[in-house]
Amino acid sequence: MVAEKCFSKIRVRESDKAKEIYLNNDELQALYEMPLDGLEAQVRDLFLVGCYTCQRYSDYSALSANNFTTTSRGTKVVRFIQKKTNTPVVPIMNDNLLRIAERYNFKIPSITDVILNRYIKDILKRLSETVPSLLNTEVTKLTMRERNMEERGDVEFMRNEDGEVIKYRYDLVTSHTARRSGITNLYLTDLFDIVQMMSISGHKDQRIFLEYIKLSSDEIADKIMAKLRQSEEAGNEGLF
């Protein structure tokens, strides 16, 4: 019992976490358009539901026809209460999400996160043949299971010249990548303020919400430059 209590207090340091990525809109659209059938199609569609709603697996995997509705003004939305925090959220439905929901008569497929995590990597690996950005590598950390496998000689992971573990982007995608992707892409639209975005994701803490925005330093620099150019075109000069 004492050991269990001690173990429950252990927290994974940020430096020990696997790399957390997001899929951009082009990658998501390519995934949406990818010809698939059977279980693979269901896994793809369930993952995209998570991306388009910005929700956790526990919520986007449990949606039923009752959750798909409209506002009093006719806006198509997904209305439910988040399981983890008991927070009511009302994400809007984009065209892709609506078509996915219609495909299943608004009863989203029920798939375990274990199956989703296994299949989505294989699906994205195949998609990388036509979407090369999925073949970019990221420095990451191995899980305990992966470290044990490597120590036993069962597998050997790629490493860069500094000895750091690297993985292809498609191999870093999990069920929770859907939520990070949705939130990051929502942020990149520049259409919504923090309050509006947090109302969609269900976050109550702005600091935690911002941790979901997974932009690289280069992406942030590009975003700043784009805003500067817009400002210059509007006649505002001399900012830098």
Model feature map: region roles:
Residues M1-K5, G50-G74, I194-V195:
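Short, charged phosphate-coordinating catalytic segments
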Residues V2-Y57, V114-I115:
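Basic, Lys/Arg- and aromatic-enriched nucleic-acid-binding interface segment
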Residues Y22, K84-N86, I200-A226:
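Catalytic-site neighborhood detector that most strongly recognizes the C-terminal catalytic loop/helix
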Residues F106-K107, K121-S199:
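Short, basic (Lys/Arg/His-rich) helix/loop patches that form interaction surfaces
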Residues A226-F240:
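C-terminal secondary-structure termini that scaffold catalytic or DNA-interacting sites
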